[in-house]
């Protein structure tokens, strides 16, 4: 009796390995069970734009699999529409073209209704995708770049609406000149652009000659000088008077060789 119960349990274990669709089964091992992930289920879609947006949401969340219910979708056009949406996400969509390695789909049924099962593999981690900085306006870009320079980031990924070409290296040089007490070294910036629509994704890579620790040490030393100089030059007076005070401060504090 005990042996029969064990055999029945084994049969049930095999039958529980069902796919995202009805009536399809896969062989399951204990390792597969422990690592299996429940597919994300999207809201039901009825139009091409809803279908495409649902795919985009799966990608933006870093989901590896998902099911899109299409019970009220025109069945005759679903196959063509999902193929077009897949190409759009992988080519035109800024996050998709940056993050997606492969996006496959299968049309079937879920709970007796038409649905699309999606599987996605990525070039970047879910954490990288979710940490993309999303700007409300391109006018916010300079503040984000300044923050990256202040933090000595080696890389910054930014989603920009209404994108226009920008000389990021010139922006960084201008920020370095305007903030000498913060930016110790002007890095070389590589700007890779993803997407083909109005919104684009910018992947900025900052290359420094000096290490992060060295720059932080330099910043600490420079801050002391700036703080002292600001006290020395503070108060009312003309620009020429302040220039003279600053000159006096620098001559008293440092030795110079011509």
Q: Where do the PLM segments sit?
A:
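Intrinsically disordered, low-complexity N-terminal segments that are enriched in acidic
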Residues: 20-205
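Secondary-structure boundary elements
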Residues: 215-258
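Generic detection of long, well-ordered alpha-helical segments
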Residues: 45, 75, 161-165, 212-219, ...
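Short domain-boundary/entry signatures in modular proteins, especially
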Residues: 121-140, 211-227, 253
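C-terminal motif of bacterial Sec signal peptides marking the signal peptidase cleavage site
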Residues: 14-17
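Positively charged n-region of N-terminal signal peptides that target proteins for export
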Residues: 1-4
């Amino acid at each position: 009796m005990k042996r029969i119960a064990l055999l029945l349990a084994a049969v049930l274990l095999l039958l529980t390995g069902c796919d995202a669709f009805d009536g399809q089964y896969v062989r399951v091992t204990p390792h597969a069970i422990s690592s299996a992930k429940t597919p994300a289920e999207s809201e039901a879609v009825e139009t091409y734009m809803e279908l495409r947006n649902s795919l985009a949401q799966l990608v933006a969340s870093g989901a590896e699999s998902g099911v899109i219910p299409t019970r009220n979708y025109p069945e005759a056009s679903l196959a063509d529409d999902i193929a077009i949406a897949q190409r759009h996400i992988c080519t035109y969509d800024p996050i998709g073209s940056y993050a997606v390695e492969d996006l496959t789909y299968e049309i079937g049924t879920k709970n007796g209704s038409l649905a699309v099962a999606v599987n996605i593999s990525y070039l970047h981690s879910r954490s990288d995708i979710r940490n993309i900085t999303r700007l409300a306006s391109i006018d916010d870009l300079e503040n984000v770049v300044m923050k990256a320079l202040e933090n000595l980031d080696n890389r910054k990924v930014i989603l920009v609406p209404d994108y226009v070409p920008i000389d990021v290296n010139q922006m960084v040089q201008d920020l370095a000149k305007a903030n000498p007490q913060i930016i110790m070294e002007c890095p070389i910036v590589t700007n890779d652009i993803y997407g083909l629509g109005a919104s684009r994704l910018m992947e900025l890579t900052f290359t420094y000659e000096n290490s992060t620790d060295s720059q932080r040490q330099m910043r600490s030393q420079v801050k002391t000088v700036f703080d002292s100089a600001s006290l020395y030059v503070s108060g009312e007076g003309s620009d020429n008077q302040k220039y003279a005070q600053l000159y006096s401060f620098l001559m008293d504090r440092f030795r110079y060789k011509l």
